[in-house]
Amino acid sequence: MRILQINNVYDRLSTGKIVADLHREYTARGIESYVSYARGPKVVQPHVQKFNWEFYAHVNKVRAYLTGILYGGNIISTLRLFSQIRRINPDIVHLHCINDDSVNIYWLLKYLKKKGIRTVVTEHAEFLHTGTCGHAYECNRWHDGCGKCPQAKSMRLLFDNTHCAWKKMMKAFDGFDRGKLCVTTVSPWLKTRATQNPHFSVYQITPVLNGIDTINFYRRVNSIVDRQTIGLTSRPVVMFVTSYFPAPLKGTHFIMELAKRLPEVDFLVLGEKGVVDYLPQNIHLLGRVYDRDRMALYYSLSDVTILVSKAETFSMPVAESLCCGTPVVGFKAGGPESICLDEYCKFVDYGDVDSLQEALTYILSQSFDRDKMSKEAIQKYSKKAMADGYIAVYNRLMEAK
């Protein structure tokens, strides 16, 4: 079986690492695996190739801003990708995140449809079934056509062309041989969202959870010394992972509020440090951490990991934390509560800080078998489990008539 994965990036950022992990896992299992990617440094590896240029991507970013159509244009890069597809001649093309000013998604879907190539489309975000936005939040306009988009300004669109973009995306998906297309989602919640679009619900939609690096993310046996090295005592420790602090969309203001309410609890924040006017003494900013062993140590020495995002389709911190034997509390954000281990997690309505504080206090008061938690999580979130899930989808497509 010959598989071609297509993604924005390779072996960097979340989806790039997922694609690289799958590529290595497939190769180890004797599957003929290829990757085509668009952005980032050129990678010199067998069967891995880049199809776009950084300058061209920036040009198309301007085009997207001027037209309000995010996933069109990209004529040259898309034609180069078609050439790679013809040369590889895959049994299955697996599309991941292809929304970074790099490929004309409408052309690509129509090309695969016309050529009768078996196709797997993985939704890592919502833009394929909404037509434009990665997170629709409370908006349901995408159910029947979009337009008058409440996020047009935040997406930096000069014109609100979301209705046209929605029609183009739905037309690209319409007419696929149902035995040749399978949509996968990274969480059960995202599947529920996708099935609300009638253009998607006619196809097979299968959740396949993201896999993480369980070789590094596992429970570490800690001592008081581990905490003392980063200035912590024996007080309860709450872990919070973010790309940047402060970051309103990631809910960092909720962390500030909880820290004020719970001065007896230490909050460990991993993420790039920004400018903060006032920081409670019990918030410890450790900056961005790239080393996975060190990340696993921080998860393991914490008593609980907290999630305060408004929307997440999966949430790597939830999976990583549980693999390290640390329970999770947070706001309901869609994906996290649908992929978690319920026994060790508690989620409350978004923005309800009182309930979040109660949930946090409750989890801190519980005694968990953290070794058992870690073993269950590793079994659920391993790269092997992810690869098994996708291979089952591939086999189903190969067997379909």
Which residue stretches match the model-derived regions?
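Conserved acidic donor-binding segment of nucleotide-sugar-dependent glycosyltransferases
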Residues: 342-353, 362-367
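Short hydrophobic beta-strand element within catalytic cores of glycosyltransferases
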Residues: 327-330
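Aromatic "clamp/platform" in nucleotide-sugar-dependent glycosyltransferases that forms part
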Residues: 310
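A charged, aromatic-enriched C-terminal amphipathic alpha-helix characteristic of glycosyltransferases
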Residues: 367-398
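Conserved donor-binding/catalytic core segment of Leloir-type glycosyltransferases
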Residues: 184, 232-250, 256-259
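Acidic anion/phosphate-binding donor-loop and adjacent secondary structure
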Residues: 195, 212-229, 277-280, 399
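Short alpha-helical donor nucleotide-sugar binding micro-motif in glycosyltransferases
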Residues: 297-302
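Nucleotide-activated donor-binding/catalytic signature segment of Leloir-type glycosyltransferases, i.e.
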Residues: 271-296
